[in-house]
From Swiss-Prot:
It comes from Eremothecium gossypii (strain ATCC 10895 / CBS 109.51 / FGSC 9923 / NRRL Y-1056). One of its GO terms (molecular function) is cysteine-type endopeptidase inhibitor activity. Belongs to the RFU1 family. One of its GO terms (biological process) is ubiquitin recycling. The lineage of its organism: Eukaryota, Fungi, Dikarya, Ascomycota, Saccharomycotina. It is found in: Endosome. It comes from the Eukaryota. The gene is RFU1. This is Regulator of free ubiquitin chains 1. GO terms for cellular component: endosome. Inhibitor of the DOA4 deubiquitinase involved in the regulation of protein degradation by the proteasome and maintenance of a normal level of free ubiquitin.
Amino acid sequence: MKSSAQLCMEARNYNFNAAAPLRLYLATCVRLVEEAQAAAQADDVARAYMLYVRYLDLCMHQLSGHREVQQPVTDAERLSRDEYEQLLRLEVPAVLRLTEELKSAVDLRHERGRASLARSVVPEAGRGEHSRQEVQLPPSFDEERFNRTVQWFLAAGRSMSLPVSAEEPAVREVFSYPELPKLSMAAESWAPS
């Protein structure tokens, strides 16, 4: 899980086009809040926090310098500016409160995750750093054949050219798996009776 600082950086990483109409960004703001609410209801605290921070950055930093907010020309632009100002008065304070609550939840989960990870990484007391565990191989294991196969793959990896001819006995031997059943594709086995 990411920390609140990492999520803030991620939230502020988006492209803002000042030439796009203000009404499109207002619709984007509504969509961001809807998605953040859905994420919060689904208990995806990190995503909800990131979306709310992106919403706040868009409303309070990016859109405040938008041309249609600064100098609206048409009636439609004035209407969009009024909607933006209403958004700042009514929604932004509520989203700020939600974001602060989510920030503490995100940081708490992040710290718990780090502590849990630290516990799982630290070796248990009394265990050697390089303890070995004996593994019992099956009786069908052929160590000589295994070593030949490993050597073949090492040689093939160095030359970067694997032999592809099925006629070569070494290749046939490497790619035959005796422990797997052999399937017969004879025509008589598929004929209807």
